[in-house]
């Protein structure tokens, strides 16, 4: 084995993690090839395994909680659900042969407040001093083991693997990640999904620096509220009796005769206007900033359409019994490099949940992505009311 001689870092173009004596994975920023059509989404659904690089995204199914990617701060080692202090980039992790959770050279440990943090100061055992006593160096930390990611997340439409420690899930207290129970009532249990990135970050060539295709034609005011979907369903119309689950990795496809759309449900709050908003828009932002997204065909001709729906799907709804299309509200093109659009739409009624369907506009077309809060990836809904800010 080789000694790890560089730390893990994410930059805008390229990040390198050198090989390690502990069989740490080798990481590079992936390359985006315009002449290939490999389904990048498949790689992140593979098992996590030992020493395989993965990213972590957390959500809560029973209570609406947006998809949050884990960020570990380089200075403190503490772990957050969004950028915080110097934790500005999403982090990657791996589980070694001893079931220790690691990021680069650093091991996970459990802090004094049961917070999940990482450190490379792990010479925690008692050592003999000049006076003959054995004392523990309190500046050192005992690495925590018993981390595992072996159980698929989701039963009906599984994606990724559940990350747990000692068979228990993690807690979110504000934006910080904790281990164990007995914390404040403001904390909540959450599901954490490990998505394999070993193949995705196995390339040495940087992402293209070309700008994303975009059309910022919407006129949404600056004080708009941005809403993230609280339900993401893959509806397979080729299997009309297959039940769908509420949270999954998104994929809309008509490739090889498939017929699958993505339903996105938003909880639209009341404003001071009570029942209406005056300006609304859908924002589409698909990039390869962290988790991979994929588009077929990749020559820029892939077009997708969004429909307003007659109602909202429920957990375990089948496509044969789900809501129906009312009318088209948006249309956009995308490539494997990504795309970014904002389009005005008719406003949904305030104080209710509302669903939109994203579907390929033609045969042999597909798009797959992982919805996340930060970096903002996927489809968000902007709502604005004149009465909200009187």
From Swiss-Prot:
Decide whether keyword Hydrolase is in the record: no
Its domain of life reads Eukaryota
Keywords, comma-separated and alphabetical = Ubl conjugation pathway
Record note on quaternary structure: Interacts with but1 and uba3.
Q: Which family does it belong to?
A: Belongs to the but2 family.
Q: What is the designated name of this protein?
A: Uba3-binding protein but2
Gene from which the chain derives: but2
């Amino acid at each position: 084995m080789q000694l790890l001689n560089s730390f893990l870092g994410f930059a805008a173009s390229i990040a390198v993690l050198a090989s390690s004596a502990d069989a740490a994975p080798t990481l590079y920023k992936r390359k985006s090839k315009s002449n290939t059509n490999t389904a990048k989404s498949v790689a992140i659904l593979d098992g996590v395994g030992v020493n395989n690089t993965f990213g972590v995204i957390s959500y809560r199914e029973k209570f609406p909680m947006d998809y949050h990617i884990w960020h570990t701060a380089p200075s403190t080692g503490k772990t957050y659900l969004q950028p915080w202090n110097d934790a500005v980039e999403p982090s990657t992790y791996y589980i070694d042969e001893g079931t220790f959770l690691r990021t680069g050279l650093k091991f996970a440990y459990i802090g004094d407040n049961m917070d999940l943090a990482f450190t490379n100061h792990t010479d925690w055992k008692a050592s003999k001093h000049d006076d003959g006593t054995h004392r523990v160096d309190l500046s050192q930390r005992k690495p925590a083991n018993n981390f595992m990611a072996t159980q698929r997340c989701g039963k009906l439409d599984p994606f990724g693997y559940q990350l747990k420690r000692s068979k228990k899930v993690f807690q979110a207290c504000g934006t910080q990640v904790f281990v164990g129970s007995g914390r404040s009532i403001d904390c909540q249990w959450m599901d954490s999904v490990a998505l394999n990135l070993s193949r995705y970050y196995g390339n040495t060539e940087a992402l293209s620096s070309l700008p994303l295709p975009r059309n910022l034609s919407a006129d949404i005011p600056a004080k708009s509220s941005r809403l993230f979907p609280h339900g993401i369903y893959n509806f397979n119309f080729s299997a009309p009796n297959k039940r769908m689950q509420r949270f999954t990795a998104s994929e809309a496809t008509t490739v090889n005769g498939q017929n699958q759309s993505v339903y996105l449900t938003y909880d639209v709050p009341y404003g001071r206007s009570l029942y209406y908003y005056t300006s609304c828009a859908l924002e589409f932002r698909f990039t390869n900033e962290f988790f991979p997204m994929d588009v077929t065909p990749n020559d820029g001709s892939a077009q997708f359409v969004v429909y307003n729906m007659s109602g909202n799907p429920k957990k375990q709804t089948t496509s044969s019994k789900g809501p129906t299309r009312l009318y088209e509200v948006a249309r956009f093109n995308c490539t494997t490099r990504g795309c970014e659009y904002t389009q005005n739409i008719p406003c949904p009624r305030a104080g209710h949940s509302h669903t939109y369907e994203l579907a390929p506009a033609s045969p042999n077309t597909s798009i797959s992505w992982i919805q996340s809060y930060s970096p903002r990836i996927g489809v968000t809904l902007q709502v604005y009311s004149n009465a909200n800010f009187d």
